[in-house]
């Protein structure tokens, strides 16, 4: 990251840019996993996905696209609890499926209402990883299905 104040308490890319007075397209931040500098597109993607900046030694880090997907797959294998339909999620959380924060288990983007409804209409299950419900966003759903279909 370029000339940023390491004492910031920013939790998001947007907050970090505001507190450090750096335009988002000029932000240089390292991936917490591989230590490579995120591209401008990855910085914007990280912000769009509403992911949190993490701190190591008072220095902010994000995660690149490749590491996010890899971590998603690792979490799926290591921390899978069980799968359930929307009804199961609603019963467990005592909330409407539309009010539950559900992220994509691959790219970690929060699912919108339409993506949650697609799970219901297609009778697709949500998965519970480490006590958190996950699903698939449209982008990851399509890329997942492309590998299955001829």
UniProtKB/Swiss-Prot annotation:
<feature type="zinc finger region">
    <location>
        <begin position="104"/>
        <end position="140"/>
    </location>
</feature>
<keyword id="KW-0862">Zinc</keyword>
<dbReference type="GO" id="GO:0039502">
    <property type="term" value="P:symbiont-mediated suppression of host type I interferon-mediated signaling pathway"/>
</dbReference>
<feature type="zinc finger region">
    <location>
        <begin position="31"/>
        <end position="67"/>
    </location>
</feature>
<dbReference type="GO" id="GO:0042025">
    <property type="term" value="C:host cell nucleus"/>
</dbReference>
<comment type="function">
    <text>This protein may be involved in the oncogenic potential of this virus (cervical neoplasia-associated virus).</text>
</comment>
<keyword id="KW-0238">DNA-binding</keyword>
<dbReference type="GO" id="GO:0052150">
    <property type="term" value="P:symbiont-mediated perturbation of host apoptosis"/>
</dbReference>
<dbReference type="GO" id="GO:0006355">
    <property type="term" value="P:regulation of DNA-templated transcription"/>
</dbReference>
<keyword id="KW-1035">Host cytoplasm</keyword>
<keyword id="KW-0945">Host-virus interaction</keyword>
<comment type="function">
    <text>Plays a major role in the induction and maintenance of cellular transformation. E6 associates with host UBE3A/E6-AP ubiquitin-protein ligase and modulates its activity. Sequesters tumor suppressor TP53 in the host cytoplasm and modulates its activity by interacting with host EP300 that results in the reduction of TP53 acetylation and activation. In turn, apoptosis induced by DNA damage is inhibited. E6 also protects host keratinocytes from apoptosis by mediating the degradation of host BAK1. May also inhibit host immune response.</text>
</comment>
<dbReference type="InterPro" id="IPR001334">
    <property type="entry name" value="E6"/>
</dbReference>
<dbReference type="InterPro" id="IPR038575">
    <property type="entry name" value="E6_sf"/>
</dbReference>
<keyword id="KW-0863">Zinc-finger</keyword>
<keyword id="KW-0010">Activator</keyword>
<dbReference type="GO" id="GO:0039648">
    <property type="term" value="P:symbiont-mediated perturbation of host ubiquitin-like protein modification"/>
</dbReference>
<keyword id="KW-1048">Host nucleus</keyword>
<protein>
    <recommendedName>
        <fullName>Protein E6</fullName>
    </recommendedName>
</protein>
<keyword id="KW-0899">Viral immunoevasion</keyword>
<dbReference type="GO" id="GO:0030430">
    <property type="term" value="C:host cell cytoplasm"/>
</dbReference>
<keyword id="KW-0804">Transcription</keyword>
<dbReference type="Pfam" id="PF00518">
    <property type="entry name" value="E6"/>
</dbReference>
<dbReference type="GO" id="GO:0003677">
    <property type="term" value="F:DNA binding"/>
</dbReference>
<dbReference type="GO" id="GO:0052170">
    <property type="term" value="P:symbiont-mediated suppression of host innate immune response"/>
</dbReference>
<dbReference type="GO" id="GO:0006351">
    <property type="term" value="P:DNA-templated transcription"/>
</dbReference>
<keyword id="KW-0479">Metal-binding</keyword>
<keyword id="KW-0244">Early protein</keyword>
<keyword id="KW-0805">Transcription regulation</keyword>
<keyword id="KW-1090">Inhibition of host innate immune response by virus</keyword>
<dbReference type="GO" id="GO:0008270">
    <property type="term" value="F:zinc ion binding"/>
</dbReference>
<comment type="subunit">
    <text>Forms homodimers. Interacts with ubiquitin-protein ligase UBE3A/E6-AP; this interaction stimulates UBE3A ubiquitin activity. Interacts with host TP53 and EP300; this interaction inhibits TP53 activity.</text>
</comment>
<comment type="similarity">
    <text>Belongs to the papillomaviridae E6 protein family.</text>
</comment>
<keyword id="KW-1119">Modulation of host cell apoptosis by virus</keyword>
